[in-house]
């Protein structure tokens, strides 16, 4: 895979009439820092005191927001400022959405950050990747739910609620949260979550309590029914035995008649 990317890189350099250099090396585990402008990455994204150079067409492919911003509203602008973020956060985000030459994989440490940016810039393909990653790991991690949210902090649930609050992945996360005791939730800073998520979690908790109560009542009803069946069976058996004994006794003559019969035989 890396060799194919390297060959592609050299072909691009040849197409732009630039001499290939031994300095151009594609390592198997390296990720670009986007600090240098190239003929195909001229668009500048500024954050704080750092600049990142990206392919605007790729941003437009991923994001309707950038497609409108860069090619409709401001087609001649060559710079975009991202605020409310740090340069390191922007760099991590770009590395996770761009093949330059390799795309950085999602991890439990960066998925919340990437999903937050993807929500902000309406990047549905990136949102889908993040959602799939969260769903796979939420179901495969330990059954210890507090351990789960040590790997997936509550920020992931917050980001998912902004992405698609009705998704199956969101349902999995809410179900996991509903299974955590209240005192453990407080240690996870649960109160900092959006109000609609908190309400959904507690609604799930209430429903769980009702379901458990219904199961206990159903179990008690089954035990009562089983006891009634046993009593009916025992009573029926007792009645049959009593009726049989009464029938046997009716066949034999009374004790007085037996003695009179014996005296007649001896005479």
From Swiss-Prot:
SUPFAM superfamilies (alphabetical): POZ domain
Amino acid composition bias (Basic and acidic residues), ranges on this chain: 258-267
GO CC terms in record: Flemming body
Highest taxon in the source lineage: Eukaryota
Region annotated Disordered, chain positions: 244-267
BP-aspect Gene Ontology terms: intercellular bridge organization
Name of a matching Pfam family: BTB
Protein name: Cytokinesis defective protein 7
Organism name: Caenorhabditis elegans
Taxonomy of the source species: Eukaryota, Metazoa, Ecdysozoa, Nematoda, Chromadorea
Gene name for this UniProt entry: cyk-7
């Amino acid at each position: 895979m890396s060799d194919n990317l390297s060959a592609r890189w050299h072909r691009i350099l040849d197409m732009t009439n630039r001499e290939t250099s031994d300095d151009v090396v594609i390592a198997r585990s390296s990720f670009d820092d986007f600090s240098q402008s190239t003929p195909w990455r001229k668009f500048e994204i500024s954050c704080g005191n750092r600049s990142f150079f990206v392919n605007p067409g790729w941003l437009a492919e991923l994001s309707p927001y950038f497609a409108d911003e860069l090619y409709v509203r401001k087609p001649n602008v060559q710079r975009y400022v991202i605020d409310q973020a740090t340069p390191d956060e922007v760099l991590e985000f770009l590395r996770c959405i761009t093949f330059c030459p390799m795309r950085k994989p999602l991890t439990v440490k960066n998925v919340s950050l990437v999903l937050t940016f993807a929500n902000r810039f309406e990047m549905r393909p990136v949102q889908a990747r993040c959602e799939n990653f969260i769903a796979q790991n939420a179901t495969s991690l330990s059954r210890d739910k507090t351990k789960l949210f040590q790997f997936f902090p509550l920020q992931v649930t917050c980001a998912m609620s902004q992405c698609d609050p009705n998704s199956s992945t969101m349902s999995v996360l809410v179900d996991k949260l509903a299974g955590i005791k209240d005192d453990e939730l407080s240690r996870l800073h649960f109160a900092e979550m959006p109000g609609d998520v908190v309400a959904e979690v507690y609604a799930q908790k209430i429903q769980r309590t009702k379901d458990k109560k219904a199961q206990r009542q159903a179990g008690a009803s089954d035990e009562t029914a089983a006891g009634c069946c046993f009593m009916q069976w025992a009573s029926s058996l007792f009645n049959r035995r009593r009726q049989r004994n009464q029938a046997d006794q009716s066949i034999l003559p009374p004790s007085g008649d037996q003695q009179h019969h014996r005296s007649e035989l001896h005479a």
